[in-house]
Amino acid sequence: MTRRQLLRLLTAAPALAVTGCAAQPASSQQEKPLILRYAENQPEDYPTSKAAKAFAELVAQRTNNKVKVLVYSGAELGAEQSIIQQMQFGGVDFSRVSLSQLAEYEPELSVLQLPYLYSDAQQMWRVLDGSIGDEFLAMLDGMDLVGLSWFDAGVRSFYTREKVTGLDDLQGLTIRVQESDMMSDMIIALGAKPAQVVYSKVYAALHNAEIDGAENNWPSYEVMGHYEVAPFFLKDEHTRVPEVQLASPAVMEKLAALDESFPEVIRACARESAQTERELWARREANAEQNMRKRGICVTELDEAEKARFRAAVQPMYDEFSAQQELIDRIQKS
């Protein structure tokens, strides 16, 4: 019960003593669930949206239906940047946003966007599900956000119009990247030229030879049809950038006032829904890769010697994070 509800009840007490029948509306009001909003910018059938629904179901179960979470998918409540701002002021209760958006507010989070940071997905989850991941989530407190759990957003690789088998073949190519200084710096470090192209126009840019290639994960490569115009896939797996499930501080306070156990219930539900999202994403990613290989896409996988060349090429980017070298070492030794 919130302080406001308690004051209302105390104020109404004398009247209730005289007319007992007046107690019924108050009792009914207490039984109404707390309605909360979850913002998701992906469509309903996307892994993150399905995980959001799983989170909502878990919350209802674990709170005995005292808390109901409504999921708004398809960016119905706004784009990610807008959602972050709404959460900071309590306008949205929960969401899932990309790490790159959060790094705009907290530069230290950019460490997690460094290329070739992890050897594989298992290492990334050891880091993020451990004490290091908790440290990064705690950084969000200073942004008036509460970090709940880590979602998977896949691993990104290059794909091109002409065959690329290693670092030498990338030299001088024009590669479309996200609007991110980190991504542009990576392309330059690898000897190519970064290009900013609206995502929906990448297919046309590849088709018209305005760019030589792009980079993304397997599902996006398949869904956007980029394999039709860039059939050479260089599986270098340069970045594994997670996404974050968030709560607003205001809603966590509201939940604590309703029941002191509810904030931890929310955190537990978030962790469970994150596992659901990762499983859904892994299946989606594996299916997309399998489909592409069946279509005859030329896939080049790097041997250890060539991987070492790629890592050496981006070392200047790591040098810029010398102040966080100890943290980087902890990540790479996990």
What are these language model-derived features?
Residues M124-L128:
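A gly/proline- and charged-residue-enriched helix-loop-helix capping module
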